Structures are given as C-alpha cells and as structure tokens.
Amino acid sequence: MATSMAAASGRFESAKSIEERKEQTRNARAEVLRQAKANFEKEERRKELKRLRGEDTWMLPDVNERIEQFSQEHSVKKKKKKDKHSKKAKKEKKKKSKKQKYEKNNESSDSSSSSEDEWVEAVPSQTPDKEKAWKVKDEKSGKDDTQIIKRDEWMTVDFMSVKTVSSSSLKAEKETMRKIEQEKNQALEQSKLMERELNPYWKDGGTGLPPEDCSVSSITKVSVVEDGGLSWLRKSYLRMKEQAEKQSRNFEDIVAERYGSMEIFQSKLEDAEKAASTKEDYRRERWRKPTYSDKAQNCQESRESDLVKYGNSSRDRYATTDTAKNSNNEKFIGDEKDKRPGSLETCRRESNPRQNQEFSFGNLRAKFLRPSDDEELSFHSKGRKFEPLSSSSALVAQGSLCSGFRKPTKNSEERLTSWSRSDGRGDKKHSNQKPSETSTDEHQHVPEDPREKSQDEVLRDDPPKKEHLRDTKSTFAGSPERESIHILSVDEKNKLGAKIIKAEMMGNMELAEQLKVQLEKANKFKETITQIPKKSGVENEDQQEVILVRTDQSGRVWPVNTPGKSLESQGGRRKRQMVSTHEERERVRYFHDDDNLSLNDLVKNEKMGTAENQNKLFMRMASKFMGKTDGDYYTLDDMFVSKAAERERLGEEEENQRKKAIAEHRSLAAQMEKCLYCFDSSQFPKHLIVAIGVKVYLCLPNVRSLTEGHCLIVPLQHHRAATLLDEDIWEEIQMFRKSLVKMFEDKGLDCIFLETNMSMKKQYHMVYECIPLPKEVGDMAPIYFKKAIMESDEEWSMNKKLIDLSSKDIRKSVPRGLPYFSVDFGLHGGFAHVIEDQHKFPHYFGKEIIGGMLDIEPRLWRKGIRESFEDQRKKALQFAQWWKPYDFTKSKNY
C-alpha cells in the first residue's frame, strides 16, 4: 500500500516548479524574438545604407550605354514585329490613297481644259513655258480653293474642347456592354426555359415556392383552429415589440392600444396556451430519469410509431422548411449529455414530436425574462425540440405572467424568434420536399426576424449553397452527419467500433446501425479528403505556370509526361499484389509494367536513367528488405526478383517523376534567387560589371582580388559548366579570353584561366576566372599546376589523373556531367582533372596554387576578404580604363 502511494505521489509536481518551467519557456521565447528583431533591424539598416551609397543603381557609364542599347534593340525588334503584322493593311491603305489622288487629278485637269485659255504677254527675262505653267498652276489652285477643296468637319473641330478618353474608361465601357449582352442572352435563354416549365411557381420569374403571404394566411387559419390563436398572439407580441423599438415608445402603451391593457393580453395568452396544451403530465414525464432498458424500449417504440405515422400520412403532410436546419448552433450548448451520439434521451425526444410541440405557460413565462450571464435558458431549440429547463428558470416559471414583462434585450430578442421555428426532424433527403405540402405538425415555419427572411431568400435562390449549409450546420447533436465532418483518428474509430459491439450486445440494434453508418461515412469522407490538395502557406505566394522538365547530369532536358489516369488511393497499409511472372513454367515478364512498355520506351528509360538512380534504387531495396532474407532458402537475388514482380499503383511512376521535377524546379529557382552572377538576382553586384556581350559578360570579383586585374568571365544565363554550354556561348567566352590576353600582354603580364565545376546538384553558376601574373611566374605556372594535380585527390582514381588540353579544349576532353577542374595558360592549352571525391577536393584548388606561387596570405584565396563599396568602385573604374581600348563589344561588326 505504501509503495503504491509513493509511486502515485511520484507523479505529482509542485505548482512552483511548473511555474518556473513556464517562466523559463517565456524568457527563452522572448530572447529568441528579441534576437530575431535585432537581426532584422540590422539587415534593414545595411540595406538602407547600401541604397544610400548607390550600390544597387551605380554602374559604369559604358555598361549603362550598353544596357540602353540592348533595350532600344529590343524595342525596335518588337516594333518590327508589329509593323510586319500591319504591313498588309498599310499597303492596302496606300493603294486606296493613290487611287483617290489619281481621280482627283483627273477631275481638276478636266475642269481646267473646259475653262477658257488666257494668253499673257511674256516677260523677256522668263521663258513663256515657265510663265504659262506657273499661271496655269495658280489658276488651278485658286479654283480648287474656292470650289473643290472643302475642309472636313473634323478639321474644324476645337480639339481642346473634346473630352479625353482613357484606356480604363474604354475597358469599363466594353465590360458594361459585355455584361448587358450577357444579360440579354440569359434573359432569352430563361424565357425559352420558362415556356416548358411545369412548376407554376417557377414560371414568370418565380422562385419555385408559393408566395409568403399565402403561406402566412394558411398558417394563421390552421393555427387558429388547432392552437386557439396561440401562435397568432405570439406573432402579435413580436410585432408590437418591433413597433415599440422603431417608434421609440413604451411597450405597454402599444399593448394597451391594441388590447386595452396588459392584463387582457396576458389573459388571452393564458387561455390560448391552456387550449393548446393536450398532455398535462408532459413535464413530469420529461423530468423522470428512465432506466437504460426503458430508454432503449421507448426509443424503439417511438421510432416504430414515427414510421407508421410517416407511412399513413396523406398529401396534406407538410414538411418543414430548410431554414430551421440553418439556425445558430449556440442553442445546443446547454445539455452536453444529450449531445452524445448514443444518448437515448435525445433519441426519445426526437421520436416524440407531438410532445415537443406543446408549450407550457411556465416555459412561455421564461421567454419574457431578461437573461443573466450565469443563466442559460434551455428554451432555445431548433424547431420545437426543447432542452430541459435549468433549475433557476424552472423556479421562475412558477411566478405570474405580470412580472415576466421586462425590458427586452438583444439576446432575448434572438431567443424569442425560436417560437416560430419549425420542427427539424427528418433526414437530409426530406429537406427538399415542397413547402406546399402539409403535415400533422401544428405549426409551420414563418420567418419573423428579418435576418431569417434574408436567409430564406438566399437559400431559395442558391440550392447548392443551401445543401452545403445543411451539411455543415446540422443541428442534431447525435446525428452522424455532424460527427463525420472531421476525419476520425484510429483511436476514435476503435472506440466507435467498441460502441457498436456494446450496442449489439445490449440489443439496441437501432443505435448499432446508426453508429455503423457514421463509421462508413467517416471512411468515405477520409477517402474524398485525401484527393483534395492540402492548403498551406504556399498558396499565399504568387502561383507560376512552368513546364516541368527533368535534367540529367549531362545536361539533357526532357519534359515530364502528365499522368494519363488519376492516381489510385493507397487505401491504408495494404499489401501489394504480386503479378504473375510465369505461364506454363515459362517466364513471361520480370516487372509489373512489362506489358505496357514497348521497346522504344525501354530504350528511352535506359538512356534517360543514370548510374546514380540505379544505385539509389538498389540501396533502398537492399536496406528495406535485407532482414527478410534467410540464408540458403531466400537470398538477396530472390528478394529482388519478387520485389520487381509486385504491382505498383496506377500512375505512381508518373507521379514520382512529377514530384522530382517539381523539386528540381524549386531548388533551381531558389539557387537562382540568391545567385551572385544572375542578372535577375537581388544580390547581383551591378557596379562590378565591366562589359556586356550578347550572351557573356565581364565583371570583377566581389571580394578582394588576388592580383591587380583579377576578373571573371560569366555567362548571362544560369549555366553550370563549360561542358554544358552551347557553341555560341563558348565562342564568345573565347573572344573575351583573347582580348584579355592581349590586354595583359601589352602590360607585360601573363594570365591564367581557371574553372572549377563541383556539386552538380547545387547547380552553381559557371565562373571562368582570369588571374594575371608576372611573366617569370607565368612561365613556371604549368610545372606547379601539373605537380599539384598529380598529387591531388585519390591515390587510385577511376579516371585519368591529368588531361592535356593543348590539342583539345575542355568541352571535348571531359565527358558531360562529370565534376572537373581545368586551367588554361594564356591562349595555349592547359590541364584538366576529373574530380573523384567532391567532398575532399577543395573549391579553391587553383587559387591555392597561385597563392603559393605569389606568396599570398591564405585568407585571400580561402574565403576572400570583403571590400567596401568605394574600393570596389575604384577597382571597377581602373579596370574599365584598361579594358576600353580592347573592348570588342562596342565594334559595329560584333
């Protein structure tokens, strides 16, 4: 006993320690937030200083001119493209204008020939021909001005008075015209549909339901006969209250105007309630706590009586309106016990609608009370299905009606509207019945609250929305529709199954069937919800439409096929079915999809597949199924054969390819976003650009240069290696290389070109570095590099250690997709080395050799030393002066 108490006490923890732990968590969270805020502010200050210094906008004047030239060429190309489309129209216009001009000249010549010829004496200094020509021309022009030429109306209009029209106003006019046209088409289509409409309430623009006035009158007639005018008096009370609020008058004065005095109205209401009450022992029966067997028996009997009533009902049966199903769910927060799916008290009340329809005077009395904060009146229900009154409201209900008339509040106003709510019984399939049908229920739903009316109109106008609201706002607490909205977990399903077994053992088959239906609906809902894409924060980002492609290591790109059929659902942890591989003791297939692949498909898969992919597949299968092998009887080969014969889900391969393509695209986009050498990147240093070609540009390093004149040749597009470049890009790189060699040669310097291609998966931008060296050091450079390459990397390598580039360049010496290091000495060839182990090979290998030759401190070639913006600008201006005589990008032939 003592040990059990000690064990039990060991699980307790003092409030002080709990509070201390919470305080530590709060302090740690505050510290993290403070640090993040400080880092953010520091980054913002750095960006602001960078902007003020002009690092984002300043560029060399020559580079700026080159960019403007590119933009002009681009605009000219676009203009030419536009002109090409409008060339035909212009030609036709010219032909018309020429034709009109020719006709005009013919008319003028006819008029001049018909007029009398005037002879003028010639002046000696002028020839008669010239004078005559001038005279005739003058005469023609005078006649044309007076008779023929007449200005058009548009030429005389004052353009300052003309109203200007913007493109937005034109778009708005077009949009309105389109809407008007669409409305006309809809009206024509609607009129054609109305001619064939059989429902009289749909014809002539109806809503499909009888008018509300008719329904109200019919309700009042029926209610007066059956309930002694109780519903009419309640509606009268609501109308008087609304009138008092609108006119800002006293409620008792309005009651006195209509009924003489408050006492008369109270007496009428009491008489009507007595006439409507048919069962005196309803309250006693309701508050009696039944046993479990009584509950089950009452539930079964009530359901059977409901089925009989439903079967014998005639055409006068009236189904309640749908808006009763869409009321607030707050009216069901009172009794949590009755909300459970297996609650038999709820079942009993559902199965006896006649009892739920009765209104006692005490219940009505509680409606006129001003509700307090700690008091929850349970008179609020959906339809006439009332929850049990609390003790406080039951005591108050015993008082007189006089003390019940108090100042109404907003909450009481909303709760009073539940008088007119109709019964919410029935399944979802009964909710679409016509409201013109009548039922044995005593009251019909009449929306008195204007919010209810607007809700009714919305539901009538939009049937799909109504169905959705009916599903999501189901009011029965124990109904399976309400609980099947969320996906049930495994534990919840197990508990539900236990409830089903328990109900079957107790003989409550109705409850068992209900729970089974709920479980089935939950399973179906889970299957449908898996096909809906999950919402995440990515949706807030701008969506892009891209062509999904796969790229192998050699740079080959091919588009991803879209899956022809939808992907089959996994359906839990089911075992995959085996495909028959043998027929009549002969092997007919190895893999599950052998029948679907042709020889061309197999060849394509073999060409597009790489050794890395095969190694991944082999390692995954070996690690997953190695434990299943048992020596001589089931070896590793047998495991691979049986695994290959398992059937995969339909469309699984296409879906995997699509996911890989999406992952590749995202990684490439992220790499290009933070790339230092892409023009579209936000981190691109524009002030370091020296010259821009067609597909290649020349810039300076973003860190301190190894030697004076250290520069970079970089492709404009995001290319990874020289072995993956196109011919025109490689040729332009060689043109920059020749110009740089010539420039440094005139200065008495030698230069070395380096390229390191590593980490193909990370997709770094290709950089071709040019480092100038003194002549005597440049002559010794091949010896240093040859010795360093021979001693680098693994001792035993798969590839040749040293590749000579004197006869062939790097693109013809190293296969595509392999990581490599290359060095070129001026315009002569150099050496290349295929990197065996990328993790051990340093990315600064070439710079380290040059640093050793020039005795440079290691921090310059390891990570680089940052420079200020002013130092970088001076460096760019100096290099631009050197480069200007050798800049081939400004030549006209380029």
Curated annotation (Swiss-Prot):
GO terms for biological process: mRNA splicing, via spliceosome. Residues 13-107, 166-281, 502-530, 644-675 form a coiled coil. This is CWF19-like protein 2. Residues 76-99 have a biased composition (Basic residues). Residues 1-147, 270-483, 561-583 are annotated as: Disordered. The keyword Ubl conjugation applies. Residues 13-56, 128-147, 270-284, 332-352, 410-430, 440-473 have a biased composition (Basic and acidic residues). There is a cross-link at residues 171, 604 (Glycyl lysine isopeptide (Lys-Gly) (interchain with G-Cter in SUMO2)). The modification Phosphoserine is found at residues 75, 360, 372, 479, 484. Belongs to the CWF19 family. PANTHER family: CWF19, CELL CYCLE CONTROL PROTEIN, CWF19-LIKE PROTEIN 2. It comes from Homo sapiens. It comes from the Eukaryota.
